[in-house]
A protein has these predicted regions:
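Active-site-proximal helix-loop-helix substrate-binding element of RNase H-like nuclease domains
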Residues: 120, 174-218, 358-359, 397-448
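Structured, non-catalytic alpha/beta "coupling" segments that mediate domain-domain communication
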Residues: 65-76, 80, 145-157, 161, ...
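A charged helix-plus-loop insertion that forms the helical arch/lid used to bind
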Residues: 29, 80-107
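Short, basic/hydrophobic alpha-helical segments
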Residues: 57-69, 135-139, 415-429
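Long, highly charged low-complexity segments
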Residues: 319-426, 430-431
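Extended two-metal-dependent nuclease catalytic cores across DNA- and RNA-processing enzymes
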Residues: 40-44, 94-314
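Short active-site loop/helix that positions an aromatic residue
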Residues: 14-20, 156-161, 396, 437-448
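Non-catalytic, usually N-terminal nucleic-acid engagement modules in DNA/RNA processing proteins
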Residues: 1-74, 84-85
């Protein structure tokens, strides 16, 4: 792949891993008190420190470092919602619920762990993670390729010929749908699991506009996830057509401001014929109010809120972000967090385990899990490994020849179900390899 700079939205990745590794009881609980009643089942250390998000974060990070081998690496964080955007609009992200306490506790701890390992991090109370990544990309993309890893599609506006967005999806199936749509093969690309790589051409094909106009699109259509209103009355389809035609909110209003009745009629007719806008949004775009955020005022404010900054001063040279992990310090952190199943395996001369050389297919559906286990019971030789802390199982990996599967503890796939599967497989196969026999027996005995 060659040298490149990898920028990771740490807040996005940690949150994704937290929710992806929650007990099913919390995922399906409707009321907050019902969720809190099951907090004791969240993965934690023997001292009661929540670690499920960090566990997934580090596993994912180590896998990327081993397989994608970024020459340079930085993790960016949101520290607060009270950034400069709240100064522009007090209700920015005002529709979001409070961060769950078990997740909130893990942000500072994850940042501390990464710092102790020697991984470069970016954080500033006045800016968001995307602003820091945007400024890093702008500074260094002329020197080498940049990859940005996140689940947030706001980052699409940063995509250029030398900056690729690795957009994460919640399931492998959703990712595969996009690969199939564009007749692309993931196997031909060196990218992480559940990620689709967006370049400028793919952004335009998927969203109908160039990357540099994504913020302007949100200026008209808004963004519910960030409580950005856009222009009330202007829908997403109309917004795409208008931005594709005019490029920016400013240029759109240059075309429609100060029109007389004849001019308004003419532009409505033009939009109808050229842009196929059967219901003209002109009245909504020109609406004015002293009490409501509408029309031009809403459009310009929304565009500004949606614009990722790319001009934050980055004083460190590229070499400062050279990928390096202090392996002794990292192992100390893994021991502190009681992550006995997470391995540091970055050096090519080291012999990786079977699970680190296989692309594991994630199995999250209970019915599918039974089907896969039935097929695996026909194999004579298997490799099996549990993932988790000292006392909690968060998943199980099974390898058979060149195929591998990962069963996370999620939805109706429980710890007891996985140990039951392990029992069945151990009884059916002739030979079973387990990387950590002591830990394997501990899990099996504890969940009888």
């Amino acid at each position: 792949m060659g040298d490149y700079l990898l920028l990771i939205d740490g807040s996005s990745l940690l949150s994704t891993q937290y929710f992806g590794n929650l007990p099913r009881e919390i995922l399906y609980a409707k009321k907050q008190e019902e969720k809190e009643a099951w907090y004791h089942k969240i993965m934690m250390t023997s001292k009661g420190v929540y670690t499920n998000g960090i566990f997934g974060f580090l596993r994912y990070l180590f896998k990327i470092i081993k397989e994608q081998k970024p020459a340079y690496l930085a993790v960016a964080w949101d520290l607060t919602r009270d950034t400069f955007r709240r100064e522009l609009y007090a209700d920015y992200k005002g529709n979001r619920s409070e961060t769950p306490e078990p997740l909130r506790e893990q942000f500072a701890l994850c940042q501390e762990v990464l710092a102790n390992m020697g991984i470069c991090q970016l954080m500033d109370e006045h800016f968001e993670a995307d602003d820091l990544c945007g400024s890093m990309a702008k500074k260094f993309e002329s020197q080498l390729p940049v990859k940005i890893l996140t689940k947030d599609n706001d980052y699409l506006q940063l995509v250029t010929d030398n900056t690729t967005l690795w957009l994460m999806h919640s399931t492998a199936e959703k990712t595969q749908e996009i690969f199939d749509k564009y007749h692309m093969k993931k196997e031909d690309m060196a990218i992480p699991d559940r990620v689709f790589p967006f370049n400028p051409q793919l952004v335009e094909e998927e969203f109908g506009i160039e990357p540099c106009h994504v913020n302007s699109l949100k200026g008209l259509a808004g963004d519910k996830s960030d409580n950005i209103t856009g222009v009330p009355g202007v829908g997403a389809v109309s917004a795409v057509k208008l931005i594709k035609e005019y490029g920016t909110v400013e240029k759109l209003y240059e075309a429609i401001d100060n029109l007389d009745k004849a001019g308004e009629k003419a532009i409505k007719e033009y939009w109808k014929e050229k842009l196929d806008l059967k219901r003209s949004p002109l009245a909504y775009l020109l609406k004015e109010s002293d009490t409501e955020l509408v029309g031009k005022k809403a459009a310009f404010l929304s565009e500004k809120l949606a614009t990722i900054k790319t001009d934050i001063p980055i004083t460190e040279p590229l070499e400062h972000f050279r990928t390096h992990i202090d392996k002794a310090a990292a192992q100390k952190e893994l021991d502190r967090l009681e992550f006995h199943s997470v391995r540091l395996d970055f050096d090519e001369e080291e012999q990786p385990s079977v699970f680190e050389t296989l692309e594991l297919e994630r199995v999250e559906d209970m019915n599918e899990s039974f089907e896969v286990i039935r097929a695996l019971k026909k194999e004579k030789t298997l490799g099996l490994s549990f993932a988790g802390t000292k006392d909690n199982i968060v998943g199980m990996a099974v390898a058979a020849g060149t195929k591998g599967y990962y069963f996370p503890v999620i939805n109706f796939i429980t710890e007891d179900l996985l140990t039951g599967f392990a029992d069945e497989l151990a009884a059916s196969c002739k030979t079973m390899y387990v990387p950590d026999a002591k830990q394997f027996l501990h899990y099996m005995t504890d969940h009888k």
